[in-house]
Amino acid sequence: MSDSDIPSSTLYKDNVDWKDITPIYPSKEEEVAVKIAVTEDFTDAFAYFRAILIKNEKSDRVMALLEDCIRLNPANYTVWQYRRVCLTELGWDLKKEMRYLSDIIQESPKNYQVWHHRRFIVETIGESAVNDELHFCSEVIRDENKNYHAWQHRQWVVRTFKVPLEKELTFALHMLLLDNRNNSAYNYRYFLMTLYDKTEDASQLDIEINLAKKFIENIPNNESAWNYLAGLLITNGVTSNSDVVSFVEDLYETTPEEKRSPFLLAFIADMMLENIENQKSAEESAGRAKKLYKDLQSIDPVRVNYYRHQSLLAQTMLIKAQTKVTAK
Amino acid sequence: MSFAGLLDFARKDVDLPQNSPNELLKDLHANFINQYEKNKNSYHYIMAEHLRVSGIYWCVNAMDLSKQLERMSTEEIVNYVLGCRNTDGGYGPAPGHDSHLLHTLCAVQTLIIFNSIEKADADTISEYVKGLQQEDGSFCGDLSGEVDTRFTLCSLATCHLLGRLSTLNIDSAVRFLMRCYNTDGGFGTRPGSESHSGQIYCCVGALAIAGRLDEIDRDRTAEWLAFRQCDSGGLNGRPEKLPDVCYSWWVLASLAILGRLNFIDSDAMKKFIYACQDDETGGFADRPGDCADPFHTVFGIAALSLFGDDTLESVDPIFCMTKRCLGDKQVEMYY
């Protein structure tokens, strides 16, 4: 673009269409209290925004002003709030608003306000917005696979509009195949199970456990997969599923010592703690737990204090178990 | 061995540059905070109008923790904060802006730091907060209706600091928090949302204020938090994310509230935080080599204070304020 294409000033104060508005600049006191350097177009646009708020004007030109304010500061919730009021009152084209929002979100995907605004629009449009919305979430997630807002927004869409379970499980699986360590995707599968009342459903639990095992086999040093596996067993404990116990023990046996992941060792140690509590070969289990925590101190030294604490816990639990037996 | 197996131990982390600072540059930070207004552009976003009261709290608190509060102009700041009060009883980020719980808490914190809380009206503030509590116990941040466990902490902390905790329905607030408690021991923003260090800090802090920490399995939560420490010593917010100074605060404060601060390797942690200092301008960045800002500066200093740095004031892990200024407003905790 050559210089001649740019208007001499893009400021509102120089724009004839805004001549009827008296801008409200920050007061001297405000400036003194917290001195802040902002650009001229920032000061200009927000001076007109303040004036509009007081005048309570809702119009097409205000919508354009709000877009400028959002561009300058997308985290300002007052601007967004006012935009919602205007949208409703002006009967604004909501599809157009969605396209506008998609652009903004692509630019600043971490902003709370934008997502909240999007939710408001989807709610207003209703059912017919669902497919586009899922597609949009997928796109943002493909760009940044742990984007907290996008996953959370997708949960909201699925919950609000009862999107079928299978379809969403497939989406989460797809994301996990692209990145076995994507904690957001594991969390999403668990969310789906909770939503569709499947956390105690034996066949669904088996599917999930097998999935976790597969991903652990593929990359044993994967915190999320191990946490997912432990989470699936939370009701009855990590030793409650014999299939999992033998899977973990086999993995330990078949992996050369120097290649064993800290998560593998910590998981077995947790199994041992559970054995002590259940008075299942308590002494032997405590001995093994302490040995594992000792190994963990050398292979994962940054958590040495944590493993020491756990080792002491194993000892404490053992003494508790033993005194319980004696008391019988 | 599979291809993925080759990447077996490739956790996400950063390298600390060799010439990184290796001690606390306390005086530089005080200058950084004190002079930020002269340093244009780089961090004006943080002090922009829409979050100015929060920005004031970060700066004032950083100075209080550094024992340099006298360098801030008390009267001007107190008057500005008071000017952010709205007729609904809450505080906005700047005069004329809508009230929001985030800024209401920051306003209350700033007034307490300057020993001026009597200038605020505790009754109207707590009524404002109460008005944002929903039937399921959650809190909206403002009238736009966004729910987040962050706002539960804001509400409970604000009312506690004003001696008005009983204004809120604490039982239902706790019930909502527990719906956000995940099987990995962490908490998310809403029921079903992924565990995140920042949200854990909010939920654990709120439970501590409510006197209901026994609702959770402390060891499970603390274990998840311990695994946030990367080999560089820094702490991340979620598995497989890069470490960041502000997570140092959220993770450490949560562990301190749970009585498990020792799960962290403090020497490695300090080394990481020191390396995030800008040794020319002062201030802390999110990671070594990035641009410093007041947000990461206050949380970097607060994190170091949790480890008992003598040159700093002692910080309270729930409220992120000096224990000195909190006095008897500190929450008693039993482990």
From Swiss-Prot, chain B:
Gene3D superfamilies (UniProt xref): 1.50.10.20
Protein name as catalogued: Probable geranylgeranyl transferase type-2 subunit beta
Residues at which geranylgeranyl diphosphate binds: 196-198, 238-250
Subunit structure: Heterodimer of an alpha and a beta subunit.
The EC number(s) this enzyme carries: 2.5.1.60
Keywords: Metal-binding, Prenyltransferase, Repeat, Transferase, Zinc
A GO cellular-component term linked to this record: Rab-protein geranylgeranyltransferase complex
Gene name of the record: ggtb-1
Superkingdom field: Eukaryota
Cofactor: Zn(2+)
Stated role: Catalyzes the transfer of a geranyl-geranyl moiety from geranyl-geranyl pyrophosphate to both cysteines in Rab proteins with an -XXCC, -XCXC and -CCXX C-terminal.
Cofactor remark: Binds 1 zinc ion per subunit.
